[in-house]
Swiss-Prot record:
Its main location: cytoplasm. This is Adenine phosphoribosyltransferase. It comes from Mycobacterium tuberculosis (strain CDC 1551 / Oshkosh). Its EC number is 2.4.2.7. NCBIfam families: PRK02304.1-5. The gene is apt. GO terms for cellular component: cytoplasm. It comes from the Bacteria. One of its GO terms (molecular function) is adenine phosphoribosyltransferase activity. Coiled coil: none annotated.
Amino acid sequence: MLNVIATGLSLKARGKRRRQRWVDDGRVLALGESRRSSAISVADVVASLTRDVADFPVPGVEFKDLTPLFADRRGLAAVTEALADRASGADLVAGVDARGFLVAAAVATRLEVGVLAVRKGGKLPRPVLSEEYYREYGAATLEILAEGIEVAGRRVVIIDDVLATGGTIGATRRLLERGGANVAGAAVVVELAGLSGRAALAPLPVHSLSRL
């Protein structure tokens, strides 16, 4: 029994050393590189693995596709580590449908807390709490379960992939607060600074890994 426990601790320590070998204080180390040599920032990693798609999902909108970032093991790990640092102290992470689920689940696992799925309208069984909002290309609805998950009194951090106008995170905040949660802040991978989402969400603390 003692040997099993010791082995588990050893594996956990080795895993931590592997993460620290290339993620150090918000910097991402190249393979085989030491902390004494140069490193690139998480923001640079995000920018290098983000694909710009013109006129999607509607004409006139430039879509920030983070699929290559999430598919890259180093990129995903660096983003997870950085977002987890900004969400420290939360006892529940709220991930926004759909790409927010990817990072929210990873961050929740890193923090050893639960994750709440904030779904698009019509995806959850009733009863639900619903909130309509407007984004840069139309109206939408977000929902959370009204029963079965207790959020009242819990310190929640909202996690999403992109902050644009602030409509999505604002609606998520209202939903959580209607359920009695203490929304401590929001953390996103990419912030589109020109769309003033941060100002729209004030005074909610907002953390972004990259501002484009």
